Amino acid sequence: MSLQASEGCPGLGTNVFVPQSPQTDEEGSRSGRSFSEFEDTQDLDTPGLPPFCPMAPWGSEEGLSPCHLLTVRVIRMKNVRQADMLSQTDCFVSLWLPTASQKKLRTRTISNCPNPEWNESFNFQIQSRVKNVLELSVCDEDTVTPDDHLLTVLYDLTKLCFRKKTHVKFPLNPQGMEELEVEFLLEESPSPPETLVTNGVLVSRQVSCLEVHAQSRRRRKREKMKDLLVMVNESFENTQRVRPCLEPCCPTSACFQTAACFHYPKYFQSQVHVEVPKSHWSCGLCCRSRKKGPISQPLDCLSDGQVMTLPVGESYELHMKSTPCPETLDVRLGFSLCPAELEFLQKRKVVVAKALKQVLQLEEDLQEDEVPLIAIMATGGGTRSMTSMYGHLLGLQKLNLLDCASYITGLSGATWTMATLYRDPDWSSKNLEPAIFEARRHVVKDKLPSLFPDQLRKFQEELRQRSQEGYRVTFTDFWGLLIETCLGDERNECKLSDQRAALSCGQNPLPIYLTINVKDDVSNQDFREWFEFSPYEVGLQKYGAFIPSELFGSEFFMGRLVKRIPESRICYMLGLWSSIFSLNLLDAWNLSHTSEEFFHRWTREKVQDIEDEPILPEIPKCDANILETTVVIPGSWLSNSFREILTHRSFVSEFHNFLSGLQLHTNYLQNGQFSRWKDTVLDGFPNQLTESANHLCLLDTAFFVNSSYPPLLRPERKADLIIHLNYCAGSQTKPLKQTCEYCTVQNIPFPKYELPDENENLKECYLMENPQEPDAPIVTFFPLINDTFRKYKAPGVERSPEELEQGQVDIYGPKTPYATKELTYTEATFDKLVKLSEYNILNNKDTLLQALRLAVEKKKRLKGQCPS
C-alpha cells in the first residue's frame, strides 16, 4: 500500500500522509473544497502542522494523530424567523460537537430581537482524523413551554484551514435574507499526539481509566457516612456513588482495588464533578441543612499513574488515579474474515473438493484454488420456511450436495431450522429424516399450553433473571421463549457460540443469521444496516466492526469491553432473528401500499444544502471528503407528532451497542467498503449513525428484503454459486428482484433479473449467471411452487389416481394452511410441504449439476487468468 502526501492544502491535510486505497466513484460525491458564498479566511502566520503517522484503512492499524483547539465565535444573526405570531423571537444558538463533547453549549438569550448579536466564543478540543460535524441550532426560548427549535446548521469542520480564521455567513433563507454569522479558528493543542486505532471507517481513540476512592476525614460510624455522588462527564459510567472509608489511601493500598472506575477518552477535556453532601447544624430547637454546589476538577492535568487528592467539603477527600487502558481492542476493526472463519474455510475446502469430485465424476482432484465457494441462501416465512427448508435440505442431502456447500445463510423462520440442526455437531452427515420427524412432532402439537399461567410464570422468572444479568428485556425475548416451548420439549441451554463444535473439522457449512439494524424513530426507508451473526463473530459489515459471538450483548466503550454479560441462550436469538412484532406503523404502511411516499415525505424534516461556489478562488482546495453544509428545518408540531406515532417500535430488540464511543474516520465516505453498503439517507449525517447510538435496534430482515444474500456478497467471501431457497408469501420473485435492484444501485456484482413476476408462470428452478461480470455469483433460484409435483410423486414417477390428492398443496390460496401467522400444522399438511420441497430439489438435479460445473469451470478460468 503506497502513501502519498496531499498537495497544496493549507487545511488539516498539510504535511499529512494519507493511505492510498481503492475508491468507488459515486454520483453526488461530496469531495472537494467548497466555501459558502460569504466564507472568508485569515492567515495567522503560525508554524507548520506536525506530521501524522499513517494508518491503513483496510486493517486495524495504530498511529499517532494530533489534536487541535477549535474556537467557535457566534457573532450574530440577521432577520431571524418568528416562532410566535405575536412576538419577536427570543433567540439563542446551541452548539453540539459530539466528537469533542456530548455536552451542548449555548449562547445567552437575546429577547424580542430580529437581529441578535452575541459575539460569544466557545472552545473545543478536536481530533483531526475523525469526522467532526458541528451542529449549530437556532432556538426560540420559551419560559412556559419547551423551547422552539427553528433550524440546525450542520457544518463539516474539515473545511477549516489550520491556523486561519474562517469567517462564515450561512444563508439560512435567501428569500427572507436570514443569515447566521460565525467565525472559526483552528490552532495547535498543547496535548501530545493521540494514539488511534482505525480501519478507515471507525476510529478508536485513547481511553484512560480513572480510579476514584473516597476517604472520610472524620472518625464517624460507617452507617452515618454518606455516599458521594461522583460524575465524570464524557465517561462510559457517567455517574457513580462512592462509599467513603476511614482507612488512609495510597496508590498501592487495597482501597484502589475496590475503587469506582470511570472509563473516559483521554483527550476529551473531561472533568470530575462531586456532589457535596449536605451539612447539618442545629441551634436550640432549630435544625437546618446547608448544601454547597458541586466541586469540579479537570482531568487533563492528571498524569498517568499520578494520585490526585481533591477535598470535598470539610468531611471528605477524593483520591483519584488515572491509568491508560490497553491499546488492544476487544472489537475487531477490519473488513477481512476473522482467523477462525478462514481456518474453517481451509478445512471445508477439503470436504467440498472431495464431494464435487464424486458428484461431478471428475477424473482429477480439484486444486485448492479451483474449489468454488458454494452457499445455500434461505429466506423467511415463519413455520412455512422452517418446514420447507427441512425438505430442501433433505433433497440436497440425497443428491450428495450438502457437502458441496460452505455456507448456509438464513433469516426469520429459516433460522429455526438452522439453530435446531446445529445442536448436532455432525448433522449434515446423518440422515435428516429423524430430525424432520422430530420437527413435525413439535409443529403439530397444541401450542396453547405454552400460554398457561404456570408457563407464563416461568417466562416471567426467566425474563427477570435476564434483566438482572444486564439485558434490556423486550417483547421479542418473550417471543423467543415462546418459540422454545413451541419447537422443543425442554429448556435449551445451547448458545450461538456452541455451534462452533459443528465447524471444528469443517464437517458442516458455516451458518450465518441475518438481521437489520434500525432506529426506533426512523423508517426503514431512511435507515437500516445489515447485521450478521455467525458462531464465530457478530457485527456490521458496513463499518467493518465485529465482536466474538459470546460477547454479543456485553457493554463496550471505544472498542474495549467494560462489562461482560453472560451470553444469551439460543432461544433469545431466535426471537431476535424472527422478530415479527418489531415493525413500526410507517414500515407496515410501506409494505402494504404503493403510495407510501406521501406519509414518508410529509412526516420528514426538511433538509437542504446551502453552500454555493466559493468567491475566493485563490484558496486551494482540499482533497478531503467534505460534506456539504446543510440546514435541517424540523417539521411542524403536527407532522412531528404524527411521525412519532408512525415510527415508534413498541417491540424492537435492543442490545448494548458495541460501537459505543467509536467515531467515524474523516474519510469514511470515501472508504470503498463503507460505500459498498452505503444505501440510506443518514449515511451522510455522521452524528446520527450507529456509533453514536446507545443501543442497537435489531429487526427481522424480511421487513426490508426477504433474503439473506448480503453476507455472501461481501468481497471477502465472494460466493461463486448461491442456491436460493425461497419461502416468502405472495410474489415468489420479489426477494430476488429486490436483491437484483439493490445490487445494481450499490454496484455489487450480481446476475440480471429476467424472470416473470407472476407466480402462475414460474418454473421449479432457474439458473442465473452473468458471463460479462466475472465477479457475479451464479444463482440457482428455487421458488416455493407446486408445479409437476401435482402429477409426480418422485422425479419420473407418476401418481396413481388415488395419489393425486397428495399432490394438491395449496401454498398461497386464501384458505392456505401455510400462512405465515400459522404456528401449527396437521401431520398431513407438514408432510406435503416437506415432500414438495424435497421433490423440487430432486427433480432439478440436472440444473444443479450444471450450476456446479459452471462454478468449477469459472474458478479454473479465473485461476488461468491470474499471473503465476
Curated annotation (Swiss-Prot):
Annotated SMART domains: C2 (SM00239), PLAc (SM00022)
Source organism of the structure: Homo sapiens (Human)
Name of the protein described by the UniProt record: Cytosolic phospholipase A2 epsilon
Record entry for activity regulation: Stimulated by cytosolic Ca(2+). Stimulated by anionic phospholipids such as phosphatidylserines, phosphatidates and phosphatidylinositols.
Phosphoserine: residues bearing it: S800
Cellular component GO terms, alphabetical: cytosol; early endosome membrane; lysosomal membrane; plasma membrane
One example of a Gene Ontology biological process annotation: phosphatidylinositol acyl-chain remodeling
Residues in PLA2c domain copies: 324-856
Function as written in the Swiss-Prot or TrEMBL entry: Calcium-dependent N-acyltransferase involved in the biosynthesis of N-acyl ethanolamines (NAEs) in the brain. Transfers the sn-1 fatty acyl chain of phosphatidylcholine (fatty acyl donor) to the amine group of phosphatidylethanolamine (fatty acyl acceptor) to generate N-acyl phosphatidylethanolamine (NAPE). Similarly can use plasmenylethanolamine as a fatty acyl acceptor to form N-acyl plasmenylethanolamine (N-Acyl-PlsEt). Both NAPE and N-Acyl-PlsEt can serve as precursors of bioactive NAEs like N-arachidonoyl phosphatidylethanolamine also called anandamide.
